[in-house]
Amino acid sequence: MKIKILIPVYNDWQSVFKLLENINSEVSNLDHEFSVIIVNDASTETKPELSINLEKLNSIKIINMKENRGHARCNAAGLKHIFVNEEFDYVIPMDGDGEDRPEEIKQLVDNLNYHADKPIVGERIKRSEGIFFKFCYFVHKIITSTFTGQSIKYGNYTCLPKSTVEKMINEKATWSSFSGALAKVEKDRASISSERGTRYFGPSKMSFKNLIIHSLSIIGVFKINVFIRSILFLLVYLFLIQKNITIVMLIPIILVFGLIVSVFMISKRESLDELNNSLLNISNIDNLK
């Protein structure tokens, strides 16, 4: 099988090169052809020379983008490039900072023996971040499940068959949220248990603002569900409090309306036209191997 590993990067070459070394080690005993596609999101940091021997990787390409578009759109453009220009059977998207553990590639690939035609997702069973992030992630899961009806416990770290990649690049939500789009286009998914690793170098680049945007982008994929469930919630809530309405009791109503507005606003980031034209943002492609 030909498996492409897709890695977005922005100003974190040290981590990516360490990840390449670890991937090379982890796939050494797997009888498949592994290649790596790195999407460089217009990094301003100088890329060092690759001085390590990566004999188990068939090829390594760096797609250099003209303009910075963000992590989700790097993944979308990478999927588009691979589908249009590469020969492959599966794509494994993963973060370039070490938090998606290369040790789990074998689990993903082994599961293809049982789920060859399904996307396989890495469902988080353990996270390495601090207490605040874990709390925010817990709240995100509760809100997502309650207002969308979706249980999305995975991120980018997945193994996608070619048929799923084709669906993803023809879904406008992929331009805004990878995991949300995958949940939308593929209802039947297999999974492995995945532990969130620690960053190889430096602190996390995920700010609280970006965390909120990331969460709303996922929820926004299912904005119609959010609207319907929100209206039902408000009707039930108003019925229950109608005889004893206070200012404090109006707070949940305000929060729900705020959620609806935020979700519909952020869903405007979704764009099939921009996804279709994403390869025009490519400056050049470096072949490291």
Across the structure, where does each feature detected by a protein language model lie?
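Cell-envelope/extracellular polymer assembly enzymes that use nucleotide-activated donors
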Residues: 2-4, 35
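Donor nucleotide-sugar binding loop of glycosyltransferases
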Residues: 12-16, 43, 101
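Short, well-formed alpha-helical segments that are part of the catalytic scaffolds
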Residues: 12-27
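Short beta-strand/loop segment that forms part of the nucleotide-sugar
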Residues: 32-43, 63-64
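A conserved acidic beta->alpha catalytic loop
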Residues: 40-49, 98-99
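Acceptor/aglycone-binding surface of glycosyltransferases and processive sugar-polymer synthases
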Residues: 65-67, 71-81, 90-93, 99-176, ...
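Catalytic donor/gating beta->alpha subdomain of glycosyltransferases that bind UDP-sugars
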Residues: 163-225
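Terminal low-complexity segments of carbohydrate-biosynthetic enzymes
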Residues: 225-289
